[in-house]
From Swiss-Prot:
GO terms for cellular component: cytosol. It catalyses: (6R)-10-formyltetrahydrofolate + 5-amino-1-(5-phospho-beta-D-ribosyl)imidazole-4-carboxamide = 5-formamido-1-(5-phospho-D-ribosyl)imidazole-4-carboxamide + (6S)-5,6,7,8-tetrahydrofolate; IMP + H2O = 5-formamido-1-(5-phospho-D-ribosyl)imidazole-4-carboxamide. It comes from Leptospira borgpetersenii serovar Hardjo-bovis (strain JB197). One of its GO terms (biological process) is 'de novo' IMP biosynthetic process. This is Bifunctional purine biosynthesis protein PurH. Belongs to the PurH family.
Length: 511
């Protein structure tokens, strides 16, 4: 059991520290402090010893060296049950420090400011703080370490109840080491980012637990949601049940797809695959077009809207069962209508484009795969017409829309579209010709015709059978990467059927 008789307090985040220090004073705890923390305590009538008076050595180098002293670290690291430690501490007049309360210079807050300069970032790298935290954490059986103001109240209760158990101290030790590890990761990551080093030789990642989820992909799987250090979620939940693991995946997919398409785009997501995408002058029309692609699959889906959700659109959405909606904005009228369906989850995120993640992380059995996200786009100038039949300007618009949709569909992916809306989606088939047939059949099953449609394929056609199947379905024009050893055969098939075909030179596999 740790009995608190002497504490060292040096904090950047001064939340609740005055009240905590007053409690320590009232319970006979001697306080040692530094710099701004010392001034704050004394200004509030709290008895505290200045660190330089305690060590007999002044703060130097404009405060860069304050606590890096044997009297400090000996007091933190001394094992009082070890006779040799006790003898040496008595010989050198090093009192035991039972409690260290430290949180670190606000490096992350500093470098998050626009236009921060290198010198300012460097001056916010804490040296003494992490050293004290690590010393106390290493000696957790004899020294309590606190790094989070939210823990002060619990410790007050424990001190008043007789002391700190080893089990409790171990919990704070783990938290302390996580705190310093996170701090070092923030520093390392920032300097790598400044150097443009996207894939450093050593990758350190720190994520903060945002919430525990009810369960994972299935009820028997435990799950939690974590946020990375440098990216704070700007998803604003407005109503609805707590987000599940699967909800978060689908909301993320809806967000990414909508953000990379034109204004007033609506996409409907089911199990990470879009089952309808469209854009129009009004998001209500876009929603109606997107939903008609596959109204059966849209049941229980998540809707992404790059635009404002108004009352009419809210009414249309609530006529069917949906898990949730993510949009740039909801009008008061829309929110009032949605409030009658309180289980529908609503998330608002105003700036779709700026919130996009740069990297895609995939854990595998023996490591972590990291790649740049597939945000690269093409323009009309990148298209290469490879057939005898040439596209019109309307055809180009339709093909470009189809191409913008296909990269979000699981491979092998085929999508049939009009100029601004999907008609049939063939997703996730092991054979490309199967995806061709699946997309056409799904359109026909809901009464949509793919005659005269634009078709995008996420990768090249390895054989002419896919082209023959598209011609049979009635497609007008095809956009695909090209690059197959049988490109000549595929082009010949398109010419035989009088189809338009363009190559992009870019593949969009999605696993």
């Amino acid at each position: 059991m740790i009995q608190i008789k002497r504490a060292l307090i040096s904090v950047s985040d001064k939340s609740d520290i005055v009240e905590f220090a007053q409690f320590l004073n009232q319970n006979g705890v001697e306080i040692i402090s530094t710099g701004g923390t010392l001034k704050l305590l004394k200004d509030n009538g709290i008895q505290a010893i200045a660190i330089d008076d305690y060590t007999g050595f002044p703060e130097i180098l404009e405060g860069r060296v304050k606590t890096l002293h044997p009297k400090v670290h000996g007091g933190l690291l001394g094992v009082v049950s070890n006779p040799a430690h006790k003898q040496k501490m008595e010989e050198l007049k090093i009192p035991k420090i039972d409690l260290v309360v430290v949180n670190l210079y606000p490096f992350l807050k500093t470098v998050s400011k626009p236009g921060v300069q290198l010198e300012e970032a460097i001056e916010n790298i804490d040296i003494g703080g992490p050293s004290m935290i690590r010393s106390a954490a290493k000696n957790y059986k004899h020294t309590l370490v606190l790094t989070d103001p939210s823990d002060y109240e619990e410790v007050r209760v424990l001190i008043a109840s007789g002391g700190i158990s080893e089990e409790v101290a171990a919990g704070y030790m783990r938290k302390a080491f996580s705190h310093t590890a996170m701090y070092d990761t923030a520093i390392s990551s920032w300097f790598h980012k400044q150097a443009g080093d996207v894939f450093p030789d050593v990758l350190n990642l720190s994520f903060l637990k945002k919430q525990k989820l009810r369960y994972g992909e299935n009820p028997h799987q435990a799950a939690s949601f974590y946020e990375p250090l440098f990216v704070k979620s700007d998803f604003s939940p407005l109503q609805g049940k707590e987000l599940s693991f699967n909800n978060m995946l689908d909301f993320d997919a809806a967000f990414h797809i909508s953000s990379l398409l034109p204004e007033n785009t609506v996409c409907i997501i089911k199990h990470l695959n879009p089952c309808g995408i469209a854009y129009a002058d009004d998001p209500l029309e876009a929603f109606q077009l997107a939903r008609r692609t596959d109204p059966i699959s849209a049941f229980g889906g998540v809707i992404g809207i790059k635009g404002i959700v108004h009352g009419e659109l809210a009414t249309a959405i609530t006529e069917n069962f949906v898990e949730g909606v993510i949009a740039q904005k909801f009008t008061p009228e829309a929110l009032e209508l949605f409030s009658k369906k309180p289980n529908i989850r609503l998330i608002e995120i105003e700036n779709f484009k700026e919130a996009l993640d740069e990297l895609d992380l995939r854990p595998i059995h023996h490591g972590l795969l990291i790649q740049e996200r597939d945000y690269t786009t093409i323009t009309e100038k990148d298209l290469k017409v490879v057939t005898k039949k040439q596209p019109t300007s309307d055809d180009i618009r339709g093909l470009m829309f189809a191409w913008s949709c296909v990269r979000f569909i699981k491979s092998n992916a085929i999508v049939y579209t009009e100029e601004n809306a999907t008609l049939g989606i063939g997703a996730g088939q092991m054979s490309r010709v199967d995806s061709v047939q699946l997309g056409a059949n799904k359109a026909l099953n809901v009464g949509l015709s793919v005659v005269g449609s634009y078709v995008a394929s996420d990768a090249f056609f390895p054989f002419r059978d896919g082209i023959d199947a598209l011609a049979k379905a009635g497609a007008k024009a095809i956009i695909q990467p090209g690059g197959s050893v049988r490109d000549a055969e595929v082009i010949q098939a398109a010419d035989e059927h009088g189809l338009i075909m363009v190559f992009t030179g870019m593949r969009h596999f999605r696993h």
